[in-house]
């Protein structure tokens, strides 16, 4: 997963739900150096009694926001979903450099 264009990541999950693995992998995919360089990361644990839905929400450096329910997809599908916009930003960045 291309994370260098993320400015903010919000992950909300039940640690005992089926979305827990995907949510933890998303958090683990963000390198520590990026966390120190200003990417805001918020994680929230929800319980079975909560009616709040699990969520992974990413805000990119160009202010675009994307969000998905991690219980409906595996990590690879989620990574591909977020990588679509990251690849567009990467291409735009490469074109600006030349």
From Swiss-Prot:
It is found in: Mitochondrion. One of its GO terms (cellular component) is mitochondrion. GO terms for molecular function: structural constituent of ribosome. Pfam families: MRP_L53. The keyword Mitochondrion applies. Keywords: Mitochondrion, Ribonucleoprotein, Ribosomal protein. It comes from the Eukaryota. Signal peptide: none annotated. InterPro entries: Ribosomal_mL53, Ribosomal_mL53_fung. Component of the mitochondrial large ribosomal subunit (mt-LSU). Mature yeast 74S mitochondrial ribosomes consist of a small (37S) and a large (54S) subunit. The 37S small subunit contains a 15S ribosomal RNA (15S mt-rRNA) and 34 different proteins. The 54S large subunit contains a 21S rRNA (21S mt-rRNA) and 46 different proteins. Belongs to the mitochondrion-specific ribosomal protein mL53 family. Component of the mitochondrial ribosome (mitoribosome), a dedicated translation machinery responsible for the synthesis of mitochondrial genome-encoded proteins, including at least some of the essential transmembrane subunits of the mitochondrial respiratory chain. The mitoribosomes are attached to the mitochondrial inner membrane and translation products are cotranslationally integrated into the membrane. This is Large ribosomal subunit protein mL53. It comes from Saccharomyces cerevisiae (strain ATCC 204508 / S288c). The lineage of its organism: Eukaryota, Fungi, Dikarya, Ascomycota, Saccharomycotina.
